UniProtKB/Swiss-Prot annotation:
The gene is tnpA. Required for transposition of transposon Tn21. Keywords: DNA recombination, DNA-binding, Transposable element, Transposition. GO terms for biological process: DNA transposition. NCBIfam families: transpos_Tn3 (NF033527). This is Transposase for transposon Tn21.
Length: 988
């Protein structure tokens, strides 16, 4: 049987942990009348209490309380109170071992508890094997088994038996998964898969290593190379649907494990496992390369459009003087002609009085050269880049397997025409080429007097293909990011079942009429209230006039007395090196235990080495430089540990450990209760090898960059971060982190800046149970939408933008609920859906319906904002915390000029995760020592007003040494449960 450990010490402890909250104690240990009747049949208070406690332990956690074990203290009193006996009676219980045995036997007989037998073990392995086909996480399997045994009233065996059954189930499931992926393969498939482990013709890399490389730059050369990779993956010609034979979680896990292994390691696997691993790598690799090719096309087109736009603007600016001179000249000529008309003089003589006829004719020619096309746009300049697109467009269109929804059929028809022309080497478009997809701004360029312009037709088709791929109207077989919109959602039959059984995981009434009645009734009441207040000039610190809305800025939030306390606590915080800080925080929380080995699940053998790799990510130093700065380590050791122990899920669970510690720390309660949060973006320039992976956003200048989008709780804990494209709005990612973080925070209200909101976000936030509160710049320009009806809101007229079109919501209500359910259940991420909805053409029904729903919620929010200074202050304070956290992150991420230089997106994600983990550790460490500083100030005669503690911040770093050699030993000896000394206090 498998011997390896699949549970950590903390996980083993959690499996049999007894509840300590009042609600859980009541839920698990409340007796009914029958229970109490049986308990009271025991003779004497000691026997009654002992019998009752044994019953409680058998029910939950499902074990027998040992002879020498004492009951869990929080459990004893509520149990003793029910049969009305004193807790001190426990000391007299079980003095005769026979009594305990008799009670245990009677409990089994009366309440149906059964001992765990070999038959139960075999059933457990069989049951767990089915679950292990979906996940190989030991804690999930062990928890499922224990829950099953409790429901069956089977007394739990020793945890070793639970772990052994779980491990055996994983082993069996692995064999079944390997067989499921390997059995459909023919000999030809196996030969082609084995060839992936051989070296390419150039001898430098294996085929597998080359196929898994990411594109270097968004240009036609790298696009063609990447298309060759996709062709190579497609040439494997794996059996159709093989990737659906096993659960996606397991397929991804096998692919990740295979990706960390060398070809030599893979070649040593027994055949079934080797072929299964290569199939997983192939299916994931094909999807990744497909998505990267589409992204390259998107970015190449973006570059060409930006270049055309810039050239257009530069040329216009360069010709500004000449245009001005011509305007002034023709102004004089025009005036001369007007005067000639009025006086009856010859018009030609009037012109020649201003300038000679030859000069006039020459000026007209110059004016024609200066003149821009009728639409005054830049699109005509795209034609200058046609050759760039032609280098890869034929191969690009040929390699992708495209399908289209009816809305994009014209685009796909145009693509088919271009494919046919490329195959036949035809230059002229057929007379019946589809033109319905051509937008008005392209019309004059494509449809010329001489017929359809081939170059602009193809440019227009490729541009519309990009837009249709973004919206999901065209999808790609084998892609992950560009699948059919339907494939992202929960299946219709599952949604119908959930709705009929009232089990939709949404925070609103799921009946359309009930929902609309509740929201529109509230909206009408709020509109009437705010209209009345505005008319009477009673809005707090706000006024609405004919010219619009004016809101008085908030006063400074930090009083002078608080600043004095801030300065005092900062002066006594201990000086600490970042290495010492991380060791100390790990001593408190054990966050490093979450960085388990990808394959075995074992903990890292060298914790200091693990912390070194995390710190290398956080301070942006990289493994090579970190090995030089950390005596006793090498690049090879760090690289191995990073490959096997640091990944997205280990960073995520370790971060949750720190966030939970902050959440439960009493001092953090001065800043909030963990129910509100804010999010903000932070831009980092890309340089060196990473420059080509960055995106340009004019907001941050002309340099390419990456954005780390981070959510922070009201207690300053950064509970999630994500690397996102600079060019996308913050609003795209707001929901992801609220839904998919792993901490115990229960966020109810969330704040963002202006870029963080759209109507779609407002709608989904409400459906999923979050109060959305963005700080909207130029709020007066953000319009209110009112229900149709006779009600007039004259005082709000400058802010009203129109009426709500509720019929769209009614028509698409089930689609809205299905979308929200899919996002909530994690079938698809909110960011992916918001990107697609934002790219839809305006007439798309679901996008319009969700927008109307969002307008209701946005209007309600603005009305609340106008009525409440406290809401404004709360949002402002929440966003200030995020901005202050960004300053700390910038200070930590100081190496390499604060630039991202990793080409791989995976490495960029690890940089963001490491940075967020270390900032969370700094926040927790500062919180602990700020509490100690406040106590020390009080103990030395300083008056510390509790109401001022909310103004302290755990985001300071002046006392933390972030530079130098990174040595993992503490300069101060700190005993278990002890803390390092504060700096000397100034006398009161």
């Amino acid at each position: 049987m498998p011997r390896r450990s699949i549970l950590s010490a903390a996980e083993r402890e959690s499996l049999l942990a007894l509840p300590d909250s009042k609600d859980d104690l009541i839920r698990h240990y409340t007796f009914n009348d029958t229970d109490l009747s049986i308990i009271r049949q025991r003779r004497g208070p000691a026997n009654r209490l002992g019998f009752a406690v044994q019953l409680c332990y058998l029910r939950f956690p499902g074990v027998i309380l040992g002879v020498d074990e004492l009951p869990f203290p929080p459990l004893l009193k509520p149990v003793a109170d029910q049969p009305k006996v004193g807790v001190e009676s426990w000391n007299e219980y079980g003095q005769r071992e026979q009594t305990r045995r008799e009670h245990l036997s009677e409990l089994q007989t009366v309440f149906g508890f059964r001992p765990f037998t070999m038959s139960h073990y075999r059933q457990a392995v069989q049951m767990l094997t089915e679950l292990a086909m979906q996940t190989d996480k030991g804690i999930v399997l062990a928890s499922a088994l224990i829950g099953h045994l409790r429901r069956q009233s089977v007394i739990l065996p020793a945890l070793n038996a639970v772990e052994r059954a779980s491990a055996e189930a994983i082993t069996r499931a692995n064999r079944r998964i390997y067989d499921a992926l390997a059995e459909p393969l023919a000999d030809a498939h196996r030969r082609r898969l084995d060839d992936l482990l051989k070296r390419r013709d150039n001898g430098k890399t294996t085929w597998l290593a080359w196929l898994r490389q990411s594109p270097a730059k968004p240009n036609s050369r790298h696009m063609l190379e990447h298309i060759e990779r996709l062709k190579a993956w497609q040439a494997l010609d794996l059996p159709t649907g093989i990737e659906r034979l096993v659960h996606q979680n397991r397929l991804l896990k096998i692919a990740r494990e295979g990706g960390q292994m060398t070809p030599a390691d893979l070649a040593k696997f027994e055949p079934q496992r080797r072929y299964a691993t290569l199939v997983a790598l192939a299916t994931e690799g094909m999807a990744t390369v497909t998505d990267e090719i589409i992204d390259l096309h998107d970015r190449i087109l973006g570059k060409l459009f930006n270049a055309a736009k810039n050239k257009h603007q530069q040329q216009f600016q360069a010709s500004g003087k000449a245009i001005n001179a011509k305007v002034r000249l023709y102004g004089r000529i025009g005036q001369a002609l007007i005067d000639a008309k009025q006086s009856g003089r010859d018009a030609f003589a009037a012109i020649e009085a201003v300038m000679s006829w030859d000069s006039f004719a020459e000026s007209v020619t110059e004016a024609q050269k200066l003149a821009q096309p009728g639409g005054f746009g830049f699109l005509h300049r795209i034609g200058e880049s046609y050759a760039t697109l032609r280098r890869y467009a034929p191969e690009f269109l040929a390699v992708l397997k495209l399908r289209a929804a009816p809305a994009a059929k014209n685009v796909l028809d145009a693509i088919e025409v271009l494919r046919g022309m490329n195959t036949d080497n035809a230059r002229k478009l057929p007379a019946d080429a589809p033109t319905g997809f051509i937008k008005p701004r392209w019309q004059k360029l494509v449809m010329t007097d001489a017929g359809i312009d081939r170059a602009y037709y193809e440019l227009c088709a490729l541009s519309e293909l990009k837009n249709s791929l973004r919206s999901g109207d065209i999808w790609v077989q084998g892609s992950r990011q560009f699948k059919d919109f339907e494939d992202y959602l929960v299946p219709p039959e599952k949604f119908t079942s959930l709705k009929q059984s009232s089990e939709l995981p949404l925070a609103v009434a799921t009946g359309c009429e009930q929902y609309l009645h509740e929201r529109l009734t509230l909206l009408e009441a709020q509109l009437a209230t705010v209209n009345r207040m505005a008319a009477a000039n009673d809005l707090p610190d706000a006024i609405i006039t004919e010219s619009g809305l004016k809101i008085t800025p908030l006063d400074a939030a930090v009083p002078d007395t608080a600043q004095a306390l801030i300065d005092q606590t900062a002066m006594v915080l201990p000086h600490v090196k970042i290495t010492e800080l991380l060791l100390e925080v790990d001593e408190w929380t054990g966050f490093t235990r979450h960085f388990t080995h990808l394959k075995s699940g074992d903990l890292a053998k060298d914790k200091n080495l693990l912390l070194t790799t995390i710190l290398a990510d956080a301070i942006n130093l990289g493994l090579t430089k970190m090995a030089e700065s950390c005596p006793g380590t090498t690049y090879a050791k760090l690289a191995w540990l990073q490959a096997w122990h640091t990944r997205d899920e280990t960073y995520s669970t370790a971060l949750a450990e720190l966030v939970n510690a902050q959440f439960r720390h009493p001092f953090a309660g001065h800043w909030g209760d963990g129910t509100t949060s804010s999010s903000d973006e932070q831009n980092f320039r890309t340089a060196s090898k990473a420059k080509s992976t960055g995106h340009i956003n004019p907001k941050y200048g002309s340099s390419p960059g990456r954005t780390f989008y981070t959510h922070i709780s009201d207690q300053y804990a950064p509970f999630h971060t994500k690397v996102v494209n600079v060019g996308l709005r913050d609003s795209t990612y707001v929901l992801d982190d609220l839904l998919y973080h792993e901490s115990d925070l229960r966020i109810e209200e969330h704040y963002t800046d202006t870029a963080g909101f759209t109507d779609h976000v407002f709608a989904l936030m409400h459906l999923l149970g979050f109060r959305f509160a963005p700080r909207i710049r130029d709020l007066g320009d953000t319009k209110l939408y009112i229900p149709k009806g006779d009600a007039a809101y004259d005082a709000l007229k400058p802010m009203i933008g129109g009426t709500l079109n509720i019929k769209h919501v009614r028509a698409h209500w089930d689609e809205i609920l299905r979308l929200a359910t899919s996002i909530k259940q994690g079938t698809v991420t909110a960011s992916l859906m918001l990107r697609k909805l934002g790219s839809y053409p305006r007439q798309n029904g679901l996008a319009v319906a969700l927008r109307e729903l969002g307008r209701v919620e946005r209007t309600l929010f603005i009305l609340d904002w106008l009525q409440g200074v406290e809401l404004r202050r709360r949002v402002h304070a929440g966003l200030n915390k995020g901005e202050a956290r960004n300053a700390l992150a910038r200070a930590v991420f100081f190496n390499r000029l604060g630039e991202i230089r990793d080409r791989s997106f995976e490495q960029q994600r690890y940089r963001a995760s490491g940075l967020n983990l270390v900032t969370a550790a700094i926040v927790l460490w500062n919180t602990v020592y700020l509490e100690r500083a406040a106590h020390a100030l009080r103990g030395n005669g300083h008056a510390v007003d509790d109401s001022l503690l909310q103004y302290l911040s755990p985001l300071g770093w002046e006392h933390i040494n972030l530079t130098g050699d990174y040595l993992w030993r503490s300069s101060a000896k700190i005993g278990a449960g002890k803390f390092r000394p504060l700096r000397p206090l100034q006398p009161a």
